[in-house]
Amino acid sequence: MSAHAAPSPEALSRRAEFKAAKTEMLERFRHAANVASLMHALSKLTDDALKRVWDECGLPATLALVAVGGYGRGELAPYSDVDIVVLLPDAHDAALDARIERFIGMAWDLGLEIGSSVRTVAQCIEEASQDVTVQTSLLEARRIVGSTALFERFTVRYHEALDARAFFTAKVLEMRQRHAKFQDTPYSLEPNVKESPGGLRDLQTILWIARAAGFGSSWRELDTRGLITDREARELRRNEGFLKTLRARLHVIAGRRQDMLVFDLQTQAAESFGYQPTQAKRASEQLMRRYYWAAKAVTQLATILIQNIEAQLFPATSGITRVLSADRFVEKQGMLEIVDDGVFERHPDAILEAFLLYETTRGVKGLSARTLRALYNSREIMNNAWRRDPQNRATFMRILQQPEGITHAFRLMNQTSVLGRYLLNFRRIVGQMQHDLYHVYTVDQHILMVLRNIRRFAVAEHAHEYPFCSQLIGNFERPWALYVAALFHDIAKGRGGDHSTLGMADARRFCREHGIAGDDAALIVWLVQHHLTMSQVAQKQDTSDPEVIKRFAEVVGNERYLTALYLLTVADIRGTSPKVWNTWKGKLLEDLYRITLAVLGGANPDAHSELKSRQEQALALLRLETVPDDAHRALWDQLDVGFFLRHDAADIAWQTRVLYRHVNAETAIVRARPSPIGDALQVLVYVKDRPDLFAGICAYFDRNGLSVLDARVSTTRHGYALDNFIVTQTERDVRYRDIANLVEQQLATRLAETASLPEPSKGRLSRLSRTFPITPRVDLRADERGQYYILSVSANDRPGLLYSIARVLAEHRIGVHAARINTLGERVEDIFLLAGAGLSDNRLQIQLETELLRAIAV
């Protein structure tokens, strides 16, 4: 807001009048959405209001008031900025400045978000030459009021100075940089309707470039010019209209400028389009799918148009580089180009051949505009007969089986809609959202991300990222079977029913139709069926229990299946969200792989042999640390078998070295160190046991912003608790070595206090969790041996959640024997092993479950 005096009664009256007229327009739009009429009406309303203020300020006729940007186009969104330039003659007196400032202040008083500049023609041209954003804004300049001669002089000077080639280069670079900010994908779960790839800004960029080059300023003019076809022009107009309408609705719903389609507004936006929820899909999911298809079409057509404009602005000095396929494809300027527009109609099998050539031909960096257009216009060719053609099936398998280029080929097949035309069930999940609180990609993008992750394991340049996975896939015969499993593992999402079971049927049919038989087909189908199994065992079950390992080994059956499942599982978790994967989950999976591999190799998974092996390894490490012989006995004699099975040899040795002198300590022993697996802090607590101990430790972690990844709780024979926690601090970058001493001191002090447990802090839920809350679930049941009770908790993640659970357990004097904390993005699925005298009482179980549900409710 400007710093001028408070608005006069006349100004307040003008503002009220302007607001009333605008409100009436927005109401009409709510009931009869014609976005073009709304934007033009808002522009005219603003023009008229500014003209009145201009006249009232008595500004001389030698000046001109010019609208620029979207306002200059006459396309004003409900709460967009109003960008104007006060154009001055070459010479003006200082007294004029005060009158111009008064005009701008009065424009603000109307309630407009004014973006203003005051320049001479020469200053405009100079600014435009230095800043492509200014140059772009002035490209759409429109006179509102004032000197026509001055505005025409500006227009002539502007176009004389405009270098269409330099403008093209700058705008394409700007578009690439903008796309990079959105990870080069239109499939964000909260896209920016204006700025994201495939959004309105892409369409505007094309029209700016075309206008600067003199090719036209509308889709019809570009059609007339031959840069696009009539069909493409219609498609562009249709999607542009949808995106403009969506943006305007977001503004109206939010009551302010709002270009990001955030979770909070998706349902309201969907309802404003008339979408209704069904049993299978929320209204918001239907809207988002429509958005993703529009963004995808815009991305495809924008690529075609930019290449065509570039060809006109920069005529190629050389033509065909080489012939790639007789009568079908050539390479031209590094792009794969069809020899004529009828190639796909004459040779439908050339559609998939294009992607095989793109994948296998060095130097080819993409498909030319001509090829993309032909693909776009060949959708009717990709029918059932085309899908069943043995030659096409063979080509598809060749694409899958190439040593490199697979990820790029499949991404391009998806971008051009060919993948969904070939695999109809894949088409069903294109643009499908996942409201499970941990996938941040649509289903099709997640599948392609998993495929990409598996491929990266096999690429030497990426071997340093996941060395163990790279080692395994290097020895894995026919890795293409993993790629097929990746394509089908989530292909049945959103159909209702178990997507693993439904996906099995799809995978089995694919194998049968593509000549995949024997063990390869069996492996692919089995992987789709069991793609969640290894993750569930590693993260939710007690893998120190030999029976758990034995059952898992029976499911897997052999080393090839185990390796395949491990590689798919790592790729799958990493493909859900950058936040879900961490080194701790990696260690859990790798440990499960190695233990199971030993069992499959003939090792006997009995507790006694494993106990003896770990103790011997730990003793060897203690000797290296110069711990006296037999010094370990004082501690080990107090520990049960479970302790040795829950910790590896290195961890047992570290804990022994810390505690062997303090077995009967009177005060708490707390030690912390950076976790050996990295990216976390390991905290050891050794103290006389008490019912509220676990809750007290969790309270400390909660208050200090530390998230618990894993808790392993042991009780010695002489009544001490030996608890180990793996914690992380996710809110900021932290060097765990630097905070280890502080954690030791603070937690030891906290455990020495006798204060009662504090009330849990109910931290704010994330926006995603608020929009898509899950129903909290609590399940309490005895384990198979009747020794412990297993408590399973599923809820939205939030700060203080673990402590809230621990506090309820402490109030009922229930001991926590072990805890497995499994955070999946915005959702937690925690498992606790409990011991308590009253847990067999049905009434106590009901009371406990009720209180836990109350504690974790949002």
UniProtKB/Swiss-Prot annotation:
GO terms for biological process: regulation of nitrogen utilization. Pfam families: GlnD_UR_UTase, HD, NTP_transf_2. PROSITE patterns: ACT (PS51671), HD (PS51831). Residues 682-763, 790-858 form the ACT domain. The keyword Nucleotidyltransferase applies. The keyword Repeat applies. It catalyses: [protein-PII]-L-tyrosine + UTP = [protein-PII]-uridylyl-L-tyrosine + diphosphate; [protein-PII]-uridylyl-L-tyrosine + H2O = [protein-PII]-L-tyrosine + UMP + H(+). Its cofactor is Mg(2+). InterPro entries: ACT-like_dom_sf (IPR045865), ACT_dom (IPR002912), HD/PDEase_dom (IPR003607), HD_domain (IPR006674), NT_sf (IPR043519), PII_UdlTrfase/GS_AdlTrfase (IPR013546), Polymerase_NTP_transf_dom (IPR002934), UTase/UR (IPR010043). Residues 325-681 are annotated as: Uridylyl-removing. Uridylyltransferase (UTase) activity is inhibited by glutamine, while glutamine activates uridylyl-removing (UR) activity. It comes from the Bacteria. Residues 1-324 are annotated as: Uridylyltransferase. GO terms for molecular function: [protein-PII] uridylyltransferase activity; phosphoric diester hydrolase activity. Its EC number is 2.7.7.59, 3.1.4.-. Residues 443-565 form the HD domain. Keywords: Hydrolase, Magnesium, Multifunctional enzyme, Nucleotidyltransferase, Repeat, Transferase. NCBIfam families: PRK03059.1, UTase_glnD. Belongs to the GlnD family. Has four distinct domains: an N-terminal nucleotidyltransferase (NT) domain responsible for UTase activity, a central HD domain that encodes UR activity, and two C-terminal ACT domains that seem to have a role in glutamine sensing. HAMAP family: PII_uridylyl_transf. Modifies, by uridylylation and deuridylylation, the PII regulatory proteins (GlnB and homologs), in response to the nitrogen status of the cell that GlnD senses through the glutamine level. Under low glutamine levels, catalyzes the conversion of the PII proteins and UTP to PII-UMP and PPi, while under higher glutamine levels, GlnD hydrolyzes PII-UMP to PII and UMP (deuridylylation). Thus, controls uridylylation state and activity of the PII proteins, and plays an important role in the regulation of nitrogen assimilation and metabolism. This is Bifunctional uridylyltransferase/uridylyl-removing enzyme. It comes from Burkholderia orbicola (strain MC0-3). The lineage of its organism: Bacteria, Pseudomonadati, Pseudomonadota, Betaproteobacteria, Burkholderiales. The gene is glnD.
